[in-house]
């Protein structure tokens, strides 16, 4: 597969936001590997974009390590795989179901990142983009599992960006309220985010033009990424778009 930019690994790439990101990257000249647990879906997306498909459970350390070894040099990791988890009263949810959300949404991000980072450091090249969520900052009232996982992911992304600053840019972003198979049952009257915004944002983050914003929280709908790039020095100097307590 000819590639202008290198290889991008997109987890959770068989549907929804991940599939949109895979399509956007492929259209821009990336060689895209689509990874997820659903073989039919990833095969379909991979065929559509002339990419590759790898069946992958991101919470399985050995499976992640095998997948990264098979793919080879990864220039861009989009750690997007996630599940919404069980709704209902926290005290009534099976702890195994609650913990499963953390395994996919948090451990899965960590395993993918820790596995690709050594190669990126060795090549002095690469970027990481993590799909977070506004649920990290705006807790709902129907489940503790999902917002807990996304709060952890946001802090993980910010901290990892600090660890790798000056070496590997790490971004985390909220795609907004996108209507997907995971969220579509919530109803039609919600303020749904246009599905094309997240893929467009990831494309900019992958380009290198936004590297000064590594470790800053970015919202695909509420933030204008081009404006943020222009204001990057101000944002860093004043510690804006950061996770913090308000007092």
Please report, for each region that a protein language model flagged, where it lies by residue:
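Alpha-helical segment proximal to the catalytic Tyr-Lys
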Residues: 118, 162-163
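Active-site helix of classical SDR
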Residues: 113, 149
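Catalytic Tyr-X3-Lys loop
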Residues: 91-110, 125, 129, 153
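Conserved mid-core segment of classical short-chain dehydrogenase/reductases
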Residues: 84-99, 142-145
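C-terminal helical subdomain
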Residues: 172-173, 188-247
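Residue(s) in the substrate-gating loop at a strand-loop-helix junction
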Residues: 133
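The beta1-alpha1 cofactor-binding region of Rossmann-like NAD(H)/NADP(H)-dependent oxidoreductases
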Residues: 55-66, 95
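Conserved glycine-rich cofactor-binding loop
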Residues: 14-16
């Amino acid at each position: 597969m000819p590639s202008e930019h290198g290889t991008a690994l997109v987890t959770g790439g068989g549907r929804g936001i991940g599939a949109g990101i895979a399509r956007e990257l492929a259209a821009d000249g990336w060689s895209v590997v689509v990874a997820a647990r659903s073989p039919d879906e990833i095969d379909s997306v991979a065929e559509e974009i002339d990419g590759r498909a790898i069946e992958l459970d991101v919470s399985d350390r050995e499976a992640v390590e095998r997948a990264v070894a098979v793919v080879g040099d990864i220039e861009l990791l989009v750690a997007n795989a996630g599940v919404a988890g069980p709704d209902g009263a926290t005290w009534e949810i099976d702890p195994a179901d609650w913990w499963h959300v953390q395994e996919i949404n948090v451990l899965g991000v960590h395993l993918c990142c820790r596995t690709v980072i050594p190669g990126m450091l060795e090549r002095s090249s690469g970027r990481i983009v993590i799909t977070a969520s506004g649920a990290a900052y705006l807790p709902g009232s129907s489940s503790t599992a999902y917002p807990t996982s996304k709060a952890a992911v946001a802090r993980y992304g910010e901290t990892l960006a600090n660890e790798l600053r000056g070496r590997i840019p790490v971004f985390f972003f909220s795609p907004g309220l996108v209507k997907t198979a995971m969220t579509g049952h919530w109803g039609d009257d919600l303020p749904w985010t246009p599905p094309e915004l997240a893929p467009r944002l990831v494309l900019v983050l992958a380009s290198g033009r936004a590297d000064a914003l590594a470790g800053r929280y970015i919202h695909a709908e509420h933030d204008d990424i081009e404006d943020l790039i222009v204001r990057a020095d101000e944002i860093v100097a004043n510690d804006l778009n950061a996770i913090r307590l308000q007092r």
